[in-house]
UniProtKB/Swiss-Prot annotation:
Signal sequence coordinates: 1-16
GO biological process, alphabetically ordered: proteolysis
Organism: Caenorhabditis elegans
Entry EC no(s): 3.4.16.-
Name used for this protein in its record: Serine carboxypeptidase ctsa-1.1
One MF annotation (Gene Ontology) recorded for this entry: serine-type carboxypeptidase activity
Length: 469
């Protein structure tokens, strides 16, 4: 306990320190960047990495960014997606990102919840849930403005991806509720391939698979005839049982274990069999928690619906085995655990190794919300603009879920589905509602800012400036 208290004290001293010399940079940064910690509760401490805008940091918007999991690091966004520097394959150097979002805004990347990345619990207890995570993220946001008061009145945006589809709306709603006590110039929130509705994600995944030629026609016809009374479009596949559940299980098993890349249907999986991405495990545990338990479901198929089985298994503590090594994160792991890098970003020597995702966080995380509808409605009602963007080749959190979710919110539609363009080419499609924009990113998977960087830079720039896409 004495060591833990000393560690907490040491971290408090390092809060907000500027990064003076980041190892491996192949360019001279024209912006300030910081790495530090926020004590967000009696026992939880969150690590953050803050990059000021390259443009006008005294005036430009401020973005708080959260990756998902639950249990995966937001530094994936920094070093793989939209940060000013991107990790090279050698795991030692960083190259400049031409489409870094800090060319138009200052960005704060928060590793959340405690136990993720370099965030930790002073007593070792990292048990958390959706409400506690949003509360501690809110505390981190408030502490940021205390640490950097010059940004207090900047236009502020809360953004994230994947299970950030829960983190971001719950945090944004909490900021809305706290405006009287702690005013923030909150202008908008944005989600990338956000996990916004559990049942919709299951239903639309099957339809997505059929629409992309992944399901045998005979199986599809059987599913429609025997399980959906001839109308599969309105069929609730989460409630099917018996042989119908078996059909749906077989489809999901192929999507996750059939050799395809769930993050991007048309992107190859990493060919190195020794690479077993932790992000795959956490996606399986987070947004498709039963994918590793088909045999057990088959034995109990007459006793439970698919949805109930998914829900039960999402609360299971059993370890998962991920057999699809689609994403290679070794360069980030090597870089973030480099002793010189740790020293440069002020990581205490007695903190453990950094990892892209935390098994312990994911297996102990308690999911409370399966539908973000009430949160999004509250946010829009309070005049906070919402952007939902989806790469249209992602199978983990597919665009059809986001599209149906947006349409079912009950907001007035102001523009029907219409192409939007970048560089005179169709970059995706947009549907506009009062206070909310739903857009797709053509040819992008789960990490759209990484795989369609120019298009995403433009889309986010337009959103920040409140300009039409």
């Amino acid at each position: 306990m004495k060591t833990l208290l000393l560690l907490a004290f040491f971290v408090g001293v390092t809060c907000g320190e500027e990064i003076k010399d980041l190892p491996g940079l192949d360019f001279e940064p024209n912006f300030k960047h910081y790495s530090g910690f926020f004590q967000v509760s009696d026992n939880h401490v969150l690590h953050y990495w803050f990059v000021e805008s390259q443009n006008e940091p005294s005036n430009d918007p401020l973005i708080f960014w959260f990756n998902g999991g639950p249990g995966c690091s937001s530094l994936d966004g920094l070093l793989n997606e939209m940060g000013p520097y991107v990790a090279n394959e050698d795991g030692k150097t960083l190259r400049e990102n031409e489409y870094s979002w800090n060319k138009m805004a200052s960005v704060v990347y928060i590793e959340s919840p405690a136990g993720v990345g370099y965030s930790y619990a002073t007593d070792g207890n990292i048990t958390t849930n959706d409400d506690l995570t949003s509360l501690e993220n809110y505390e981190a946001v408030k502490q940021f403005f205390t640490e950097f008061p010059q940004f207090r009145h900047h236009q502020t945006f809360i953004m994230g991806e994947s299970y950030g589809g829960v983190y971001v709306p719950t945090l944004t709603a909490r900021i809305v509720d706290g405006q009287k006590d702690f005013p923030i110039n909150l202008k908008g929130m944005a989600l990338g391939n956000g996990y916004v509705n559990e049942k919709l994600n299951i239903d639309t995944s099957v339809r997505f698979a059929y629409g992309h030629g992944l399901i045998d026609e005979k199986i599809w016809n059987t599913l429609e005839r025997d399980c959906c009374r001839g109308c599969i479009d309105s069929c609730d596949l989460t409630q099917v049982t018996g042989h119908c559940a078996t059909l749906v299980e077989d489809i999901f098993q192929f999507l996750w274990f059939g050799g395809l890349n769930p993050y991007d249907l048309y992107r190859d999986c990493d060919p190195n069999p020794s690479v077993n991405s932790k992000r795959m495990k956490h996606m399986l545990r987070g947004v498709a928690p039963a994918m590793a338990h088909f045999d057990e479901l088959l034995k109990n198929q007459t006793k439970t619906s698919l949805y109930q089985f998914l829900k039960n298994k999402s609360q299971s503590q059993k370890p998962l085995k991920a057999d699809v090594p689609c994403l290679n994160d070794t360069e980030m792991l090597s870089y973030m655990n480099n002793p010189k890098v740790r020293k440069a970003i002020h990581i205490p020597f007695n903190l453990g190794k950094w990892d892209i995702c935390s098994d312990k966080v994911t297996t102990t995380y308690q999911k409370q919300y399966t539908d973000m509808t009430p949160f999004i409605k509250k946010i829009v009602k309070n005049h906070v603009r919402v952007l939902l963007y989806y790469g249209d080749t992602d199978m983990a959190c597919n665009f059809m879920m986001g599209q149906q979710f947006s349409d079912q919110l009950g907001l007035r539609r102001t523009l029907k589905k219409t192409p939007w363009k970048y560089d005179r080419q169709i970059a995706g499609f947009k549907t506009l509602f009062d206070g909310l924009s739903f857009i797709t990113i053509r040819g992008a998977g789960h990490m759209a800012p990484q795989w369609r960087a120019p298009q995403m830079y433009y889309a986010v720039q337009q959103f920040l400036n409140n300009h039409p896409l």
